A protein has these predicted regions:
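C-terminal amphipathic helix plus adjacent low-complexity
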Residues: 1-81, 139
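Short, conserved beta-strand segments of beta-strand-rich sandwich/propeller modules, principally
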Residues: 67, 128-132
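Residue-level recognition of well-ordered beta-strand positions that form the cores
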Residues: 69-73, 85-87, 120, 134-136
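Short, surface-exposed loop/turn segments at beta-strand-coil junctions that are enriched for proline
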Residues: 75, 120-128
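Solvent-exposed serine/threonine-rich low-complexity stretches and specific carbohydrate-binding patches
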Residues: 95-110
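Aromatic sugar-binding surface patches on proteins
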Residues: 108-120
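Short acidic/polar inter-strand loop motif in beta-rich domains
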Residues: 125, 136-147
Length: 154
């Protein structure tokens, strides 16, 4: 159990610490520069359109495909600086209570400053489900998607 915890958490943190400090802390400087750019330009990201099933009219059903498409105007950011995902959870009292699973959307196209993200996912849970779409800054150098502090639900 202790070895598993060490492998899953402490080992990865130790490796990351070494990487961040390497080459005169180059990785740390790159992350800081990227975060400053995100902080400056994140407000420029505008949702142009969202196409999703209307779960207020009919519940999501087991085995059905869930199709989603979101178009974003990226402003000064590159589309690869943005990630989109769908969060699925159990519905209780008209709202999402517990997150059951998330599915990453893919960037399908980018033209004239507008990125199109989409996905198709089979529903593999029975019961009343709800969903939310969230976008967040993406960078392979950061430790988690919440690290930037700019997660936005649309």
């Amino acid at each position: 159990m202790l070895d598993e915890y060490n492998d899953k958490y402490y080992g990865k943190l130790a490796e990351r610490a070494v990487a961040i400090k390497a080459d005169g802390c180059l990785m740390a400087k790159n992350i800081a520069d990227w975060k400053a750019d995100i902080e400056k330009h994140w407000p420029e990201v505008v949702v142009k359109s969202v196409k999703v099933p209307d779960s207020s009219k009919r519940a999501l059903r087991f085995g059905e495909p869930f199709k989603v498409e979101v178009k974003l105007e990226c402003g000064s950011l590159r589309p690869e600086d943005i990630a989109m995902e769908v969060v699925f959870g159990s519905r209780k009292g008209g709202r999402m209570e517990d997150v059951l699973f998330t599915r990453q959307m893919e960037m399908k196209s980018f033209a004239r400053g507008v990125a199109t993200f989409s996905g198709e996912f089979d529903i593999r849970y029975a019961g009343a489900l709800d969903y939310a779409i969230r976008m967040y800054p993406a960078n392979p150098l950061i430790a988690s998607k919440q690290e930037s502090g700019f997660v936005r639900y649309i």
